[in-house]
Amino acid sequence: MLVYQDLLTGDELLSDSFPYKELENGMIWEVEGKWVVQGAVDVDIGANPSAEGDGEDEGVDDQAVKVVDIVDTFRLQEQPTMDKKQFIAYIKKFIKLLTPKLEGEKQEAFKKNIEGATKFLLPKLKDFRFFVGESMHDDSCIVFAYYREGATDPTFLYLAPALKEVKC
């Protein structure tokens, strides 16, 4: 199994269990999330409740909770929304922090294509929810989530150069 960590913080953000599609010259990975129900478990032990007292279920008080699989699996933490000015400031800081961590061709491709990726993300800002890894470090790579028109499940966008592949 492959896990993708935030190159800046080491937080796990994604794994190969979630297929991705490359966008913007490979700068952005698009991943489909899914709402899943977690929690309540209905266990049938074969007992006959009508023969056991007043018929009320005295089982465990489980509460079912709906979560997004990617957010839950990688313990992503939601962040406040950003306006255009905040986003540009974040991208400038991100470029400054990430560029020295990339080597050779990866660094050149990053410098060449980050502007296109930024222009791709900018018009969608108002629709995004923002997430970072579990550590919630100030230098974390942001994961962007939004709903396509008519979709019931969120789509996640990752800045691919900030992901480090680790074999588990």
Curated annotation (Swiss-Prot):
SUPFAM superfamilies: Mss4-like (SSF51316). Its main location: cytoplasm. One of its GO terms (cellular component) is cytoplasm. It is found in: Cytoplasm. Pfam families: TCTP (PF00838). Coiled coil: none annotated. Transmembrane segments: none annotated. The keyword Transmembrane helix does not apply. It comes from the Eukaryota. Residues 1-168 form the TCTP domain. Keywords: Calcium, Cytoplasm. GO terms for molecular function: calcium ion binding. Involved in calcium binding and microtubule stabilization. Belongs to the TCTP family. This is Translationally-controlled tumor protein homolog. It comes from Cucurbita maxima. The lineage of its organism: Eukaryota, Viridiplantae, Streptophyta, Embryophyta, Tracheophyta.
